[in-house]
Amino acid sequence: MTDRLTDRLSVIGMRFSGRHGVLPHEKVEPQPFEVDLVLHADLRAAGASDDLADTTDYGSLFDLTAAIVEGRSFDLIEALAAAIARAVLAATDPALVGAVEVRVRKPKAPLSGAFETVEVGILRRRDDAPTDRAG
């Protein structure tokens, strides 16, 4: 399957409010988070058929990501990204999606200097052995 996964389906710059971080105030006050998803997929059937049934609905990817970011609180954005990746792989057709890249940005991270954002990026392949502990 990996040799067919040269196509990409991306949802970039999704914006949510969440309570993620290790500091006490980060658990109380919502702060902005941005998430990008890049699915490594086989989009040939969808390209030929023009049928939503032959691809992954990016509206459902947005809703799934929103539920995770705006729901449970994580200490680390690494754990948040891993939870999103697991959920995306669980919710998508294994014949279509073989891997997902997740980038989580925290533009209001509690740093003492000027910066644009803090970002974590992960790649999870469906056929990789699970290495994440958090769920």
Where are these regions (language model features)?
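N-terminal, polar/charged subdomain of small-to-medium soluble alpha/beta proteins
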Residues: M1-G135
